[in-house]
Amino acid sequence: MKFLRVDHIDIVCADLKKSLEFYRKFGMHPEGTIDGGKTVFLFNGDEDRPVRIELHQAKPGDKTGIDHISFGVDDPVDATKEIKYLGGVKFAFEPFENQQSGRTISNSHDPDGVLVQMCRKTAAGTYKNWE
C-alpha cells in the first residue's frame, strides 16, 4: 500500500468568509457547499495537478487549523487491513462510504496526533448537488 496523492486538506476556520477570500487569492474556486454553507469545497481547476481544500466553519469550542490530511489510495479497505496486519496504527473507525463526498474513507492518527485519512473516490457523491 502506498499513498498515490494528497486528495485534500481539511481546515477548520474561525471565520469561513475570511478564509474563503484568502484562498481565492491563490486561485482556489468554490466547487460547492454542504451543511447549509458551513463547509465549502475549493478546487484550483487543474485536473492534471489538482489541489483541493475543504473549509469548515468552526463551532464554539472547536480548535481551528488543519483538521486532517487526506491521501488517495487504491483501496482504503485493503489499505486499512494491510496496515492493521503490520500493527502499531490505531484507526478512528472502520472504512466507510461517505455519501456526501462519494469517497470510501478510513481515518487514523500519526504519532503526533495528526488525523490522516485514506480515501478513494467511489461514487458521484451528493455534495455535487451544491447548496
Give the positions of each predicted feature:
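N-terminal beta-strand motif that seeds the catalytic metal site of vicinal oxygen chelate
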Residues: 1-17, 66-69, 119-131
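Core segments of cupin and vicinal oxygen chelate
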Residues: 3, 10-51
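Vicinal oxygen chelate
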Residues: 6-14, 33, 43, 60-131, ...
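Short amphipathic alpha-helices in soluble, non-transmembrane regions
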Residues: 22-26, 82-87
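Short polar/acidic secondary-structure junctions
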Residues: 45-47, 60-61, 97-98
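A contiguous binding-surface segment within folded domains or other stable secondary-structure elements
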Residues: 48-54, 64-68
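Conserved beta-strand in the GNAT
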Residues: 53-56, 116-117
